[in-house]
């Protein structure tokens, strides 16, 4: 079982975060994380401009302990108190329910939704459509501790070009098997966005 801590940052200079991703990864991996990615929201309604630092852990406690150790590092404290440092404005904990491919830098399109988790057959259909359209990885997450969004789910589609995401969405949302699965699970999208992944 894997969990993701998602810390949201707001500020005028995302380069402070982007330029220090190697250090952040060094520190969280030293505490047992499989790594950290930064999602710079570029088209996400009211979330546009936010950066979300997502770190991946084997347990919730390990995640919190690992992040606490990172925040206590003098190098991180120096970054956090610098004049242009973004401010942490929120944090979510999610549980990984489905995965396909290996996520990495590039782009991501995400959809938050209400409804049950997809079954094996439904996920296989989604991954086949994604693969045909150049999607490099998929993660489906259960938003466990996410304020008013708790109990929803999020599907994240990683890609090398935003065109991959757009083409995949066009096929997926008109696919009869996907539509049938959406009816079975009670799928209702509540938010959608695009991000640069660092």
Label each PLM-derived region with a short phrase.
Residues 1-198:
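Short S/T/G/P-rich N-terminal loop/turn motif that feeds into the first structured element of a domain
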């Amino acid at each position: 079982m894997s969990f993701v801590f998602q810390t949201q940052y707001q500020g005028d200079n995302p380069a402070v975060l982007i330029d220090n991703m190697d250090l952040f990864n060094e520190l969280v991996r030293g505490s047992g994380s499989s790594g950290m990615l930064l999602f710079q929201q570029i088209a996400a309604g009211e979330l546009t401009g936010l950066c979300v630092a997502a770190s991946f852990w084997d347990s919730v406690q390990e995640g919190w302990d690992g992040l606490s150790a990172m925040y206590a590092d003098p190098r991180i404290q120096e970054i956090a108190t610098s004049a242009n440092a973004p401010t942490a404005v929120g944090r979510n904990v999610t549980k990984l329910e489905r995965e396909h491919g290996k996520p990495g830098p590039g782009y991501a399109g995400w959809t938050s939704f209400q409804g049950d988790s997809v079954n094996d057959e439904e996920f296989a259909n989604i991954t086949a459509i994604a693969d045909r359209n150049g999607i490099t990885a998929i993660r489906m997450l259960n938003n466990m501790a996410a304020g008013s969004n708790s109990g929803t789910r999020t599907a994240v589609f990683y890609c090398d070009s935003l065109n991959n995401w757009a083409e995949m969405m066009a096929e997926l949302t008109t696919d009869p098997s996907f539509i049938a699965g959406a009816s079975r699970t009670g799928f209702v999208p509540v938010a959608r966005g695009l991000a640069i992944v660092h």
